Swiss-Prot record:
The gene is rplQ. It comes from Listeria monocytogenes serovar 1/2a (strain ATCC BAA-679 / EGD-e). One of its GO terms (molecular function) is structural constituent of ribosome. The keyword Methyltransferase does not apply. Part of the 50S ribosomal subunit. Contacts protein L32. This is Large ribosomal subunit protein bL17.
């Protein structure tokens, strides 16, 4: 089974797919070209399937691919030096969101975690644009 070259060298293509896959996990919906969306779909489906396994090996494989990007910052209660409770800001990363939020959502689903909606041609060059989102 082949893949699309997307007019780039292999390192550029890998970086593009990493960025778009991370963005799809973070935002759960992105707008891109049709060819890119079809390639991202393959990558994200495999990441979510490994996220459903949830073991250490799956987490390390996903960490090797997903960018170390902060999704949001949450406040948590922590103990201070004097024993009082203090509010601390703790970042939530894309990998953590994949394993804690996204993958458990699809525990009963056997594949088909993404949806591609056609949007129409891009104004500048007429490239077919789509919206890819997590179902």
């Amino acid at each position: 089974m082949g893949y699309r070259k997307l007019g780039r060298t292999s390192s550029q293509r890998k970086a593009l797919l990493r960025d778009l896959a991370t963005d799809l996990i973070v935002f759960e919906r992105i707008e891109t070209t049709e060819a890119r969306a079809k390639e991202i779909r393959k990558v994200v489906e495999k990441l979510i399937t490994s996220g459903k396994k949830g073991d250490l090996h799956a987490r390390r494989q996903a960490a090797a691919f997903i960018r170390h990007e902060v999704v949001e910052v949450v406040q948590v209660d922590a103990k201070g030096k004097d024993g009082s409770t203090v509010k601390k800001n703790r970042p939530v990363y894309a990998l953590q969101k994949l394993f804690d939020d996204v993958a458990p959502r699809y525990a009963e689903r056997q594949g088909g975690y993404t949806r591609i909606l056609k949007k129409g041609p891009r104004r500048g060059d007429g490239a077919p644009m789509v919206i890819i989102e997590l179902v």
